[in-house]
Amino acid sequence: MTTMDYDLGDDAAELRTRLRQLIANHVPAGFLGACTDDPQDLATTESFCKLLAAEGLLALAWPKEHGGGGGSIWQQTVLREEMWAHHEPRGPQYMGINWVGPAIMRHGTAAQKAKHLSAIAAGEVVWCQGFSEPEAGTDLASLRTRALPDGPNGPNGTGWRITGQKVWTSYAQMASWCVLAACTHPDAPKPKRLTLFLIPMDRPGITVRPIPSMLGPHHLNEMFLDGVPAFPGDVLGEPGDGWRIMREALAFERVGIARYARCESLLHRLRTELGDDWDRLPESIRIRWVRALVDLRVARLLAYRAVSLQEDPRAGAAASAARIATTICDQQVAELLFDVLGPAALDSGVTAPLHGAIEDHWRYAQAATVASGTIEVQRMLVARDVLGEHR
């Protein structure tokens, strides 16, 4: 059996201390996360991202020529953990940093890199992801949005016209750009049907409508695309190569969301708040608490394995395994905290236990089972990897 030792480097503790000081000094108590639609919270995320960028921390592991900090993937892992442990004060910027930027670095043209990467690294632009559809959430290869050729006699002179609908599009109401998947080759095999486009959200034909949800703040949307013009310079990678790039990007996304760190933080913070009351908790609760911490350690190690395999064909399945473990822990911790606090777990505001973070976490834990692909699909991806059935 191979033993894996994930060394975050000698400077990990120093980096954590630096990040925690920045958060303590610039993020107000009671801030609850990436999906806020509160104007004051959005202003906090915007100013905090600009501060991180000025410190060379926002895109810590990006190459310096693209505006990054030139750090290691393990330094970036520490950054992710500290951000999620403090309810992701980067707000909607995490999407651009975690996977949109890396996808453009890997597959973009020189012009696309010059246009987009420095702006993402500076925290100046919000991106959204136009993948899921009403009839294609889990099986993205079956999406129905079409990019029809717009030949020499069309309005573009060359390119496509995109028509269709997207759902569950986070941040579309505030995004400046969208990574949009559309079918350009309907007669090709499924993996070769799709193309990714980098589309400005102010392009004619795009309509965004909010989707109310149990998550509370408005961050989910549906997008309607009515003959949206797309040009050759908008294509990320090659036409027909969208499915491969999407799978790679989704692996980055799953690893980039370090929710296990948020769960650990909630447990440790509540243990501190309980003080002497900890000893009066039923033994069954304390046993569950310890088991939750052990399971979170497993989720963390699975995430580290996925990070270590970023350039490996097994990266997608490793990311799925990490996401499965984290999602299970999300719900396990949410239920445990509710059992400890009872009705007080529903309180919100700065006077509530953990400033209301427990109720907020419970709602997001329910949604985590379907976000970025259902947990059942993640298990299927892991099974294919174990059986050697790569597709």
Q: PLM features: residue spans?
A:
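Amphipathic, small/basic residue-rich leader segments at the start of a protein or domain
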Residues: M1-P92, K115, A119, N156, ...
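Glycine-rich phosphate/cofactor-binding loops in nucleotide/flavin-utilizing enzymes
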Residues: T2-D5, W74, V78-L79, W99, ...
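Glycine-rich beta->alpha junctions and the first turn(s) of the following alpha-helix
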Residues: Y6-D10, I206-A299, A368, R384
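C-terminal helix-coil-helix/basic helical segment that borders enzyme active sites and/or dimer interfaces
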Residues: F31-P39, G275, D279, E283-R286, ...
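Internal helix-loop-helix
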Residues: A53-A114, S118-G123, Y171-W177, L296, ...
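A short, Trp-centered hydrophobic/proline-enriched beta-strand micro-motif
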Residues: G123-F131, A181
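A short core secondary-structure module
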Residues: L143, G159, T163-V208
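Intrinsically disordered, low-complexity terminal tails and inter-domain linkers enriched
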Residues: P149-G159
